[in-house]
Amino acid sequence: MTSKEYAMLAAKTLDEKKALDISIIDIAERSGFADFFVLATVSSLRQMISLTDMVDEKLAEQGLIIKNIEGKGESGWILMDYGDLIINLFTEEARNKYQIEKIWGDCETIDFKEE
């Protein structure tokens, strides 16, 4: 699978499990550390932890192994590093605070529901 296909799989898994405001950002042209970000908002710490496990399991089934995970949810943000793919799960408050979409605003976003 390509990095984009992994990003799509992660986004679809998050969508199936009721994450909110899911987006995929293609950062390959501006980044030397990854090709795609997947961003999603969660409604609770419990959901954040559950989604972390579910997405990791789904990607591992396809051969993509996590390299690192940052945060434990208490900060309102968990970052899952798969190398070319970075998945960010936020509480609504943390997502508004860090404004990742604004930082990478000139990058292409991908609609995972249409692909």
Task: Locate the predicted segments by residue.
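Ribosome large-subunit tunnel/peptidyl-transferase-proximal elements
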Residues: 1-53, 57-67, 108-115
